[in-house]
């Protein structure tokens, strides 16, 4: 069961920038830093010290001015923000603490640290040092257990992908992509420079898999949806479409698969054409009106694939149970984190946090 977040605001979209994968935490904060001309503001402070609230305020201010933004949600708690990207300003403010620690490469030049540590009363925290340390350790242990379940699910899903790959006609996929791109991606004027943003459209969270369908509706009016239960065909389709879009000079938003981010793309946006190529499966059902649906079984020898039926069914059932268990452990870790926040919140001077928020608004031209 996948939660889809539906709020459609064309000037404000939602993504993740990191998630727990079978290989551990995978973040795209560094590629964001390397996007051309991106000015980074790196927030440092403890849990419950107002980082997310500060960023939410800045996001609202930008929205009120009609500025396009991307809200970056935290996969451990999707109601909380890990960052806000201000597209017109080429600026981003992000939570630069674990598990996505960032330090400035060029302090002051392209990055500024926004420290909120001065808002903490260390003496008040020190009185609860043992309890705070215990909760940090417990949170880490629960997240590690969740990661192991995600890793197990990942290996089963990879096994299914390999089974489908044994039955797929990849030459047919290549010919199809050539025709599709000729039809949907008009050639741009000579010298158009291609660029790419990496974002996650879905993630495994304490609420289960979350998919930001509202972002799709905000960024595109035309949808080509590849229905692929196992991922081998859609993986090649998206890889080839990405290469073709970049070769033709388009700016694209590439959304890696949250389970196998290093070798599989799930979705791709071409904002200039308001066009999206999407993968639809049980983990993130697309369910949008007026889509051009492509069933990936057309590229597969179904008779051959039928020989794997029992194995594929087992993998799907077992992976679903493992991911359910992972979400449950993540929910326990979040409850632990919430308890940790109560200690920090009691030790924070929120007047000073408000001052820092006003300073940030000034730096970003949102005052």
Q: For the regions a protein language model found, what residue spans apply to each?
A:
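Conserved nucleotide-sensing/catalytic segment adjacent to the nucleotide-binding pocket
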Residues: 7-24, 60-124, 131, 245-324
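N-terminal low-complexity, Ser/Thr/acidic repeat segments characteristic of secreted
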Residues: 11, 39, 190-194, 222, ...
């Amino acid at each position: 069961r996948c939660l889809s977040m539906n709020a459609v605001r064309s000037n404000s979209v939602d993504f993740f920038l990191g998630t727990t994968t079978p290989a551990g935490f995978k973040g795209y904060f560094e590629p964001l830093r390397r996007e051309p001309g991106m000015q980074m503001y790196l927030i440092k402070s403890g849990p419950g010290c107002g980082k997310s609230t500060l960023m939410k305020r800045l996001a609202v201010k930008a929205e009120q001015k009609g500025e396009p933004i991307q809200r970056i949600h935290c996969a451990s708690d999707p109601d909380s923000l890990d960052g806000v990207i201000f597209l017109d300003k080429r600026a981003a403010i992000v939570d630069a603490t674990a598990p996505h620690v960032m330090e400035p490469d060029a302090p002051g030049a392209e990055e500024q640290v926004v420290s909120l540590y001065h808002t903490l009363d260390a003496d008040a925290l020190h009185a609860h040092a043992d309890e705070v340390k215990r909760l940090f350790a417990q949170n880490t242990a629960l997240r590690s257990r969740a990661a192991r379940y995600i890793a197990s699910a990942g290996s089963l899903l990879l096994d299914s992908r390999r089974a489908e790959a044994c039955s797929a006609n990849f030459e047919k996929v290549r010919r199809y992509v050539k025709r599709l791109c000729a039809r949907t991606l008009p050639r741009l004027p000579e010298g158009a420079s291609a660029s790419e943003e990496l974002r996650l459209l879905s993630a495994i969270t304490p609420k289960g898999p979350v998919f930001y369908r509202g972002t799709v509706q905000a960024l595109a009016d035309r949808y080509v949806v590849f229905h692929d239960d196992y991922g081998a065909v859609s993986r090649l389709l998206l890889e080839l479409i990405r290469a073709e879009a970049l070769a033709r000079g388009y700016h694209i938003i590439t959304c890696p698969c949250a389970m196998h981010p290093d070798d599989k793309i799930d979705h791709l946006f071409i904002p200039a054409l308001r066009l999206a190529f999407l993968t639809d499966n049980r983990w993130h059902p697309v369910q949008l009106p007026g889509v051009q649906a492509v069933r990936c079984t057309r590229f597969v020898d179904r008779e051959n694939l039928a020989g794997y039926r029992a194995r594929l069914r087992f993998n799907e059932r077992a992976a679903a149970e493992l991911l359910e268990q992972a979400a449950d452990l993540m929910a326990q870790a979040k409850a632990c984190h919430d308890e940790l926040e109560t200690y920090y919140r009691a030790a924070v001077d929120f007047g000073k946090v408000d001052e820092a928020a006003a300073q940030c608004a000034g730096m970003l031209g949102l005052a």
